Amino acid sequence: MRDLHKKKPRPVTQNRLKKPPKTCKPINYRGILKKTAKVVGGAALISAVGCAGYGIYRIIAGTTFFKLERIEVSELKTLKRQEIIDLAGVREGDGMFGLRLRSIGEQIGKNPWVSRVEVRRYLPNTLSMQIAERQPVAVINMGYLYYLDANGDVFKPLTEGDQLDYPVITGISEEDIARDPAGSKGALKEVLELIAHLKSRADFKLDEVSEIHYDKGYGVTLFTAAAGVPVKLGSGDYSRKLDRLARIYKELQTQISVLEYIDLDYSDKIIVKKV
């Protein structure tokens, strides 16, 4: 009979192969030191080259061979040569490598007459400054008088000595420009196109106009140089309207002192209103 109380023999587990213990590699201090030495040496070399380069720069900058001797300024219409040199803040004897061209250009560009400036250095001793000046084509009255250039940009308040021999534009204020810059710029360009057309005419020329008034709701009204008679043009089609005026203007000149206005803003007629 089986002995139920007899313990069963435990199965023998298969012996696992034991891995040999890992052996720690010795630290290669010599390799680490070599790499560290290379990094430190490279940094030292870069630093030394930088210091040497700066030293060479100082020597070159200080040598009399690279001193400013010639200052070239492009031909000017309004500004004076010495004004540009004073704005640039340079003088003969300055070190050529110490000239900061961008800063010089920015200083010159602060003058309202300057629209564009180009500054160049030519070794061993020349500084060149090419200046493009703004040219006024009209005066705009916004409480104060300002010059207006061909792009429709208001660029300078008039001061004592400035010329006034330009057509005067009215009807556009500083508040208009601040509130609606794009619309105001468009209106000014429209007026400038009319001025350009008047300049090109052989009859009823720009000289016969003293003021050009712009009204956002109506358009353009001219005022004659003689007696200040309003000439209502409205908006657009200026060439045809002025052609019609030119045909009768010589006759009207004899009685211009009694005219209240001339209205050209019609397609088929001209209205001449007397006082």
Curated annotation (Swiss-Prot):
Xref: Pfam families: FtsQ_DivIB_C (PF03799), POTRA_1 (PF08478)
One GO-annotated biological process of the protein: cell septum assembly
Major subcellular location class: membrane
Coiled-coil features, chain-numbered ranges: none
Region named Disordered: 1-20
PROSITE patterns xrefs: POTRA
Database matches in HAMAP family: FtsQ_subfam (MF_00911)
Family: Belongs to the FtsQ/DivIB family. FtsQ subfamily.
Its biological purpose: Essential cell division protein.
Name of this protein: Cell division protein FtsQ
